[in-house]
A protein has these predicted regions:
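ABC ATP-binding cassette signature C-motif
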Residues: 1-163
Length: 163
């Protein structure tokens, strides 16, 4: 679902309430894992290294740590060996975004909620993100004002919010 509308209408507020399960009149079914990408990266712990952040998610989801899988997935998001041991707080905004996306893939959510996922991402990295989202097989709610990005992703439904 592509959610669109003018700035200030409450798209981010709606997404957050859906992700937190506090939206009036909407309930996510019990047992559905929700992945939430916030444009302010507040889902990341800036004190963790990239490795620690990815490892925590992997251990939470699978109960084990598969270093080879984690590194392979990280590489798909341009997270290289020199970045993996860096504290998240020391990364550029674009690198934080790539870490947030790698975490989402590791989480294997049934519902993916994305609030302006192209913000802070280097334009050269957008195809990497678009490809990952296009291959995603669960439900997705996306807010993005970047039409060139959205065109690269399979969108089944569109909802325009207006006052």
């Amino acid at each position: 679902l592509l959610l669109s509308g003018p700035n200030g209408i409450g798209k981010s507020t709606l997404l957050e309430s859906l992700a937190k399960g506090t939206a009036k009149g909407a309930k996510i079914m019990e047992g559905i894992r929700v992945g939430y990408y916030r444009q302010d990266f507040s889902t990341l712990n800036f004190e963790d290294s990239v490795r620690e952040s990815l490892t925590k998610v992997l251990k939470e989801v699978t109960g084990k740590i598969d270093e080879e899988y984690m590194r392979s997935l990280a590489a798909n998001f341009l997270i290289t060996g020199d970045i993996i041991n860096t504290k998240i707080g020391d990364l550029s905004e674009g690198q934080k975004g790539l870490v947030a996306f790698a975490r989402l893939v590791l989480e294997r959510p049934g519902l993916l909620i994305l609030d302006e996922p192209t913000n802070h991402i280097n334009f050269r990295h957008l195809p990497v993100i678009a490809r990952a989202l296009d291959q995603y097989e669960g439900a997705m709610i996306l807010v993005s004002h970047v039409s060139e990005f959205v065109e690269q992703i399979r969108i089944d439904e569109r909802l325009e919010l207006d006052k």
